[in-house]
C-alpha cells in the first residue's frame, strides 16, 4: 500500500538502506542527497554529532523545497570513545571489524524531519548497543572482499551481510 502525502516527502540521502526503509513503510518520496560537511566538531558528543548532521542534511534541502517534508539522517559507530567512519579500503575495513570483533559498541542514528514552509523541525537520536561475535579470519576475508563494508559507518550493515557478525542488539 502506498501512502500519498499532501506535501511531498524528500529523502536528503542517497542511502539505499534508508530508501528501502521508506519504501517498506509504503511511503512515496523523492531522493535529493544533501552534501554537507560531516566533520566531527571538537567537543561534540556522538549524540550531538548525529543530531547536527541529520538536521544539517535536512535543512540543506528544505531551504530549496519549502513546501515539502525533508528527512535527513546520519549514523555513526562508536567504540572505545572513537567514531568509526566509512572504510575507504580493505585495510581500513579489516581494522574496523577487528576492533569490533567479540566486543560491544554503540550505534547512534540521528534523524530530522523539516518543513521550512511550516516552520517545523523535529529531531531525535536513537542509540543501540551492538555486540559482535568473534570474527574468524575466513569470515573477515570473505566480508572485506564483498562490496558491502565500504559505504557504511563501522564497515557493516545490520540489514546486510554484516548481520552475520552480530551476537546481540539492545
For each predicted feature, which ranges?
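N-terminal G-site helix/loop of the GST-like fold
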Residues: 8-31
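A short beta-strand-loop structural module common to alpha/beta enzyme folds
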Residues: 30-39
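Flexible, glycine-rich phosphate/dinucleotide-binding loops
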Residues: 18, 38-40, 120
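Cofactor-binding loop segments of dinucleotide-utilizing enzymes, especially the Rossmann-like FAD-
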Residues: 14, 34, 116
Amino acid at each position: 500500500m502506498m501512502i500519498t502525502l499532501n506535501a511531498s516527502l524528500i529523502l536528503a540521502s542517497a542511502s539505499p538502506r534508508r530508501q528501502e526503509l521508506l519504501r517498506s513503510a509504503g511511503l512515496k518520496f523523492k531522493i535529493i542527497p544533501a552534501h554537507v560537511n560531516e566533520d566531527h566538531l571538537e567537543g561534540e558528543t556522538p549524540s550531538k554529532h548525529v543530531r547536527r548532521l541529520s538536521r544539517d542534511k535536512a535543512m540543506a534541502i528544505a531551504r530549496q523545497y519549502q513546501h515539502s517534508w525533508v528527512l535527513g539522517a546520519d549514523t555513526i559507530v562508536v567504540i572505545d570513545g572513537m567514531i568509526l567512519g566509512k572504510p575507504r579500503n580493505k585495510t581500513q575495513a579489516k581494522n574496523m571489524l577487528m576492533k569490533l570483533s567479540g566486543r560491544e559498541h554503540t550505534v547512534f542514528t540521528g534523524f530530522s524531519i523539516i518543513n521550512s514552509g511550516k516552520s517545523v523541525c523535529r529531531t531525535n537520536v536513537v542509540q543501540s548497543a551492538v555486540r559482535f561475535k568473534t570474527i574468524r579470519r575466513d569470515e573477515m576475508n570473505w566480508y572485506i572482499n564483498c562490496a558491502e563494508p565500504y559505504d557504511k559507518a563501522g564497515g557493516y550493515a545490520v540489514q546486510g551481510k554484516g548481520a552475520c557478525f552480530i551476537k546481540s542488539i539492545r
